[in-house]
Amino acid sequence: MRFSFMSGGKGPTQGTGKRVAVIGSGPSGLAVAGYLASKGHEVTVFERLPLPGGVMVFGIPEARIPRERVLGGCKELEEVYGVKFRTSCKVSANGDLLLGDNLAKENIELQGVVDENDATIIATGTWNSRGLPAENATYKGIHSALEYLFRCKANELGLISRKERIKLGRNVAVIGSGLVAVDAAIEATAEGHNVRLISIEHQFDSPSGSYEIGRLKKKGVEHFERTVIKKVLGEGKVESVETIKVNAEIKAGVILKLEQIPGTEQIIEKVDTIIVGIGQVPTPPFNKEYRDIKTLRWGGIEVNDRYLSSKGKVFATGDITTGITKVGRAYQTGLKTAHWVDRYLQG
């Protein structure tokens, strides 16, 4: 997988003497790094996890994006374009603890990084998950899809032990029909679990696309569409769920209207694990008390049409500005951002 878009693999143009920091190494962060390094800028990528690649390495199943392709692209950036990767290094301004932060060996203040560079690009993505909006949502056996996938990948990479993976029961209900939910269903099915998918969308309205849901069905996954969990049943742990059919009006991934249909309640027996994949929340490298960089109501970083934030020489890109998207769109956003950063650095 190539991240060096501007020079055809020939290496960077003559150095500009400008220093750039990229915080986060998912698809948008790597697109920014590749573009700017190709233009001759000195780029350092800060990544809180032990390997670069973000969700492409620590979330998406191998069958969809082979991690070696991603790591190979990062190696090219390092060896051919001089990009420096500082992994296991969290950059923040009193930022909240995130999934995988325990693997970081170094913590650096955001302001110090901003001061030492001519431009800083925040590409920290969406690493917090939305909870299950149902009664008894705190019962044992309920997990986020992102954490489940992360622990699977971290174990495969030898970063955590097998015992630190999330242990699923025999019968799993995955909630949601976006790519994170679908990827969790793929992983759970591959592990040999009996998987059901429950979503408010019809198959043909699913954020992941009808094809992905169809693939799951061919693997034996039962899809309860236009359905939500009303109540988790059991004695302090998941044993079954009560569902209800819904009418939903959804536009651009936003639920505008959701009505439960009385009389359509159903008990799904023998559910001992619930994996929740109904959306993720932006995770900027600072908490709500940080006022230097403006955020939007939903938590993303506010940027102008050139991806510049409210703080001078600090840009933001990818899912931290748009909400969760597919890898291709995050890539494109990174390239657009890098174009404007390059223009900014040229004066």
Regions found by a protein language model. Give the residues of each.
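Glycine-rich dinucleotide-binding loop and its adjacent helix/turn
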Residues: 2-14, 76, 85, 129-191, ...
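Ferredoxin-like iron-sulfur electron-transfer modules
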Residues: 5-23, 28, 57-58, 89-90, ...
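Beta1-alpha1 glycine-rich phosphate/pyrophosphate-binding loop at the start
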Residues: 16-98, 130, 135, 179, ...
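Conserved beta-strand-loop-beta-strand element in the redox core of flavoprotein oxidoreductases
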Residues: 93-114, 234-266
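Short hydrophobic core segments
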Residues: 116-125, 272-278
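FAD-site-proximal beta/loop scaffold in flavoenzymes
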Residues: 138-169, 251-324
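Mid-to-C-terminal Rossmann-like scaffold of FAD/NAD(P)H-dependent oxidoreductases
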Residues: 215-218, 228-239, 247-249, 336, ...
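A conserved FAD-binding loop/helix module that cradles the flavin
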Residues: 320-347
